[in-house]
């Protein structure tokens, strides 16, 4: 693959560069890095729960934080 992943977050298109190590891990898991942009990002449930707890006084920021973490 090219080492780049296109990520589209509503109203914010981004292109992220995969490190060589990340690309190798994805390939070992059977993922084709060139098709990653077509796959949904899965955020582990504990991460979502923890984010919501940390940001419960700023609920509008919780989704932004999850989006940002998922884009990395």
From Swiss-Prot:
May interact with a ClpP-like protease involved in degradation of denatured proteins in the chloroplast. It comes from Populus euphratica (Euphrates poplar). The lineage of its organism: Eukaryota, Viridiplantae, Streptophyta, Embryophyta, Tracheophyta. GO terms for cellular component: chloroplast. It comes from the Eukaryota. The keyword Chloroplast applies. InterPro entries: ClpA/ClpB_AAA_lid. Transmembrane segments: none annotated. One of its GO terms (molecular function) is ATP binding. Belongs to the ClpA/ClpB family. Keywords: ATP-binding, Chaperone, Chloroplast, Nucleotide-binding, Plastid. Signal peptide: none annotated. Pfam families: AAA_lid_9 (PF17871). It is found in: Plastid, Chloroplast. This is ATP-dependent Clp protease ATP-binding subunit ClpA homolog.
